[in-house]
């Protein structure tokens, strides 16, 4: 049974989502503020965090940043509007996905399960790209022999690119493969995740040699020369 931490200040929304997600088979702990949510996170280890953007005191963006300093738990943001700035800031803060309110419990449940599947083990082979080694059995990535701390979404994106070295994948292809949804052209999810992934796997993230941008298409993972 997946365990969730729901951080939402609106009592009605928090209660409704807690009830719906519990009925869907999740164990749900709740907090009404960012401070309380961070305290709960120190006391228990959820499988995933559902985090409202507009919180009293510490907002959802800052909560997300603080979590990402020490933890790679998957995070889904709840935002009241499909605002470009809110979405971009949220994704750059380290969120794996976002859902626009109002949201039905079963829709959020589908997103949660899709995010959790990204960390599931798959094939038993490994792949090497220079100093970068991807172990698909252990679901680990090392660079120069040191473990990299990737979120489930970052790991899944790297796995999908590594299956097709040298092949360009469009943003829409990556949305389907990694996020399991067509977001009506919302390539910001892909671009933000690539940016975070490059910061961890590239020697010089501003001049990437592994994860290359294919102009007008998307991205590819290049084997080292």
Curated annotation (Swiss-Prot):
<feature type="modified residue" description="4-aspartylphosphate">
    <location>
        <position position="52"/>
    </location>
</feature>
<keyword id="KW-0597">Phosphoprotein</keyword>
<protein>
    <recommendedName>
        <fullName>Transcriptional regulatory protein AfsQ1</fullName>
    </recommendedName>
</protein>
<comment type="function">
    <text>Forms part of a two-component regulatory system AfsQ1/AfsQ2 involved in secondary metabolism.</text>
</comment>
<dbReference type="InterPro" id="IPR011006">
    <property type="entry name" value="CheY-like_superfamily"/>
</dbReference>
<dbReference type="Pfam" id="PF00486">
    <property type="entry name" value="Trans_reg_C"/>
</dbReference>
<dbReference type="GO" id="GO:0006355">
    <property type="term" value="P:regulation of DNA-templated transcription"/>
</dbReference>
<dbReference type="InterPro" id="IPR039420">
    <property type="entry name" value="WalR-like"/>
</dbReference>
<dbReference type="GO" id="GO:0009295">
    <property type="term" value="C:nucleoid"/>
</dbReference>
<dbReference type="GO" id="GO:0000156">
    <property type="term" value="F:phosphorelay response regulator activity"/>
</dbReference>
<keyword id="KW-0238">DNA-binding</keyword>
<dbReference type="GO" id="GO:0032993">
    <property type="term" value="C:protein-DNA complex"/>
</dbReference>
<keyword id="KW-0963">Cytoplasm</keyword>
<dbReference type="Pfam" id="PF00072">
    <property type="entry name" value="Response_reg"/>
</dbReference>
<dbReference type="GO" id="GO:0005829">
    <property type="term" value="C:cytosol"/>
</dbReference>
<keyword id="KW-0804">Transcription</keyword>
<dbReference type="InterPro" id="IPR036388">
    <property type="entry name" value="WH-like_DNA-bd_sf"/>
</dbReference>
<feature type="DNA-binding region" description="OmpR/PhoB-type">
    <location>
        <begin position="124"/>
        <end position="223"/>
    </location>
</feature>
<dbReference type="InterPro" id="IPR001867">
    <property type="entry name" value="OmpR/PhoB-type_DNA-bd"/>
</dbReference>
<dbReference type="InterPro" id="IPR001789">
    <property type="entry name" value="Sig_transdc_resp-reg_receiver"/>
</dbReference>
<keyword id="KW-0902">Two-component regulatory system</keyword>
<keyword id="KW-0805">Transcription regulation</keyword>
<feature type="domain" description="Response regulatory">
    <location>
        <begin position="3"/>
        <end position="116"/>
    </location>
</feature>
<dbReference type="GO" id="GO:0000976">
    <property type="term" value="F:transcription cis-regulatory region binding"/>
</dbReference>
């Amino acid at each position: 049974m997946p365990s969730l931490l729901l951080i939402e200040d609106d009592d009605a929304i928090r209660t409704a989502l807690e009830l719906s997600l519990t009925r869907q088979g999740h164990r749900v702990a709740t907090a009404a503020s960012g401070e309380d949510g961070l305290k709960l996170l120190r006391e228990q280890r959820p499988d995933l965090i559902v985090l409202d953007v507009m919180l009293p005191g510490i907002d959802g963006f800052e909560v997300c940043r603080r979590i990402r300093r020490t933890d790679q738990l998957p995070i889904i943001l709840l935002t009241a509007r499909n605002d470009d700035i809110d979405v971009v800031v949220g994704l750059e803060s380290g969120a794996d996905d976002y859902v626009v309110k109002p949201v039905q419990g079963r829709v959020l449940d589908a997103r949660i399960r899709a995010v959790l599947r990204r960390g599931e083990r798959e094939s038993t082979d490994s792949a090497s790209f220079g100093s970068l080694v991807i172990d698909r059995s252990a679901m680990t990535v090392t660079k120069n022999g040191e473990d990299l701390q990737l979120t489930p979404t970052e790991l899944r994106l790297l796995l999908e690119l590594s299956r097709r070295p040298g092949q360009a994948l469009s943003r829409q292809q990556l949305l389907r493969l990694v996020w399991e949804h067509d977001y009506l052209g919302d390539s910001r999810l892909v671009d933000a995740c690539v940016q975070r992934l490059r910061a961890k796997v590239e020697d010089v993230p501003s001049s990437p040699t592994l994860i290359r941008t294919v102009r007008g298409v998307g991205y590819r993972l290049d084997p080292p020369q």
